């Protein structure tokens, strides 16, 4: 499972809105998973079970974004890839999941940086 932690100098509600916009603009479905977590999905789960990673862009992926507050009041976003959806596609699915996570971690960092609120990514 891949993970990136973003430290952001903005209120948590503003950050949640920006993150939601980044992913919905890219055709992800964004749904609340718990009070502090958004689940993002894209692709077709049933077809991915049948055809695996050969589904191309329609391959089902599910990832999570956890929101919290750091020790100095900064907003923390933990962006996690999911191994569950990747297992559907075997080794190719795992590779696709990790590659997609890296791609969107970069897009999220760019969106936050363009607003001059990104403090760090680790």
Q: Model features per residue range: what roles?
A:
Residues 1-122:
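Ser/Thr-rich, low-complexity intrinsically disordered terminal regions
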């Amino acid at each position: 499972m891949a993970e990136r932690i973003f430290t952001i100098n903005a209120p948590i509600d503003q950050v949640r809105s920006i993150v939601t916009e980044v992913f919905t603009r890219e055709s992800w479905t964004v749904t609340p998973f718990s009070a502090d977590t958004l689940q993002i999905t894209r692709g077709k789960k049933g077809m991915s079970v049948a055809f695996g990673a050969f589904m191309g862009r329609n391959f089902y992926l599910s990832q999570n974004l956890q929101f919290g507050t750091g020790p100095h009041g900064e907003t923390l976003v933990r962006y996690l890839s999911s191994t569950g959806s990747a297992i559907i596609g075997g080794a190719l699915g795992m590779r696709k999941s990790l590659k997609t996570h890296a791609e969107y971690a970069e897009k999220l960092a760019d969106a936050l940086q363009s607003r001059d609120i990104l403090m760090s990514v680790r």
